[in-house]
Amino acid sequence: MSSIRFLCQRCHQALKLSGSSESRSLPAAPAPTSGQAEPGDTREPGVTTREVTDAEEQQDGASSRSPPGDGSVSKGHANIFTLLGELGAMHMLSSIQKAAGDIFDIVSGQAVVDHPLCEECTDSLLEQLDIQLALTEADSQNYQRCLETGELATSEDEAAALRAELRDLELEEARLVQELEDVDRNNARAAADLQAAQAEAAELDQQERQHYRDYSALKRQQLELLDQLGNVENQLQYARVQRDRLKEINCFTATFEIWVEGPLGVINNFRLGRLPTVRVGWNEINTAWGQAALLLLTLANTIGLQFQRYRLIPCGNHSYLKSLTDDRTELPLFCYGGQDVFLNNKYDRAMVAFLDCMQQFKEEAEKGELGLSLPYGIQVETGLMEDVGGRGECYSIRTHLNTQELWTKALKFMLINFKWSLIWVASRYQK
């Protein structure tokens, strides 16, 4: 005999079924399609397809899910049952096939299984159904009483008021729909304006960044120009200081320095003259004559004087004078020394010609109220320098028939006259 075990889905307690329930719970073999039993079918006459149908109807609400393993009762699944028993050996092949098919449907979730509840769970289920039935009957009675008393009926005035209110609500709805459409249009227009504003803002941001870049470049150029301006201002200030300093400097006295060193006259650190006790080289004397020639020519050019009879050509230690009447005549203002120095008539003629040019400058500078007044006189015909302010002695500038001391003294007087001439020209013509 088959053995089937069931558990209560709610309390998970084992159920003990009666014989009739157990026989009805056995899976029935499928009925033949022709309505007749197959040969060898040993099914009992009392088992019909109706019983199978009843068994299927009892499976409504059942679930194929397994009950919880801890044995607790789930309130949400109080009416759900699962077949957990195992089917014993069946004597009929059709019953075995039906059982295998049902098991496959249960496992695949395509069929549900139902089995009876225990007595306590059944009582609990009936109590819940009674409560729901009582609530439903109470609602039904309330509706019935309202219908009888006319509480749900409305008068004509109330219906008219409701219709008027409905029309007002419809008008309000139409107005709100129109407002909604206006709002939508405004939103669309605002969205377009926003998009345009965002595009304009992006363009303005780009322009701002470009302006900042341009500003940075201009600021850098400004700083560079400020640095250059500072440098130029410093250079200008330095130039002004130098200009002011140069204004205080006399170009004549700065270019030609003349002083007396004992019995010798000195021009630009070159001694003009020689003594037996002071041996001055002829190269130094020649250079001193070149400086004196340059000074006399500069003074003449300053006052606009053109020399007559001679043209002064300063060439350092080889300066000379050239006759204006005879181009072949050159009078050297230099000498190479030797025993016949004081017998050199050409050298003496050059020095006398130099005194002639100096006398021409003196005569031109003496003109006017602020004329030049030299401390020593010049006698061109005899080639003498006269001590006008002293004892009136004269000293020859020639070397012929003269001593070194007297010749050197005449040269010193000549340089002193040049110093006075420098001061006069600087005070009158220096701007």
From Swiss-Prot:
One of its GO terms (biological process) is cellular response to nitrogen starvation. Disulfide bonds: none annotated. It is found in: Cytoplasm. Pfam families: APG6 (PF04111), APG6_N (PF17675). Residues 125-248 form a coiled coil. The keyword RNA-binding does not apply. GO terms for cellular component: phagophore assembly site; phosphatidylinositol 3-kinase complex, class III, type I; phosphatidylinositol 3-kinase complex, class III, type II. Residues 17-74 are annotated as: Disordered. Present in fetal and adult brain (at protein level). Changing residue 211 to L: Increases homodimerization. Decreases interaction with ATG14. Residues 173-243 are annotated as: Required for homodimer formation. Changing residue 208 to L: Decreases interaction with ATG14. Probably strongly increases homodimerization. Keywords: Autophagy, Coiled coil, Cytoplasm. Changing residue 190 to L: Decreases interaction with ATG14. Increases slightly homodimerization. GO terms for molecular function: phosphatidylinositol 3-kinase binding; protein-containing complex binding; protein-macromolecule adaptor activity. Involved in 2 distinct lysosomal degradation pathways: acts as a regulator of autophagy and as a regulator of G-protein coupled receptors turnover. Regulates degradation in lysosomes of a variety of G-protein coupled receptors via its interaction with GPRASP1/GASP1. Belongs to the beclin family. Homodimer (via coiled-coil domain). Interacts (via coiled-coil domain) with ATG14 (via coiled-coil domain); this interaction is tighter than BECN2 self-association. Interacts with AMBRA1, UVRAG and PIK3C3/VPS34; these interactions are not disrupted by starvation. Does not interact with RUBCN. Interacts (via N-terminus) with GPRASP1/GASP1; the interaction is direct. PANTHER family: BECLIN 1 (PTHR12768), BECLIN-2 (PTHR12768:SF5). This is Beclin-2.
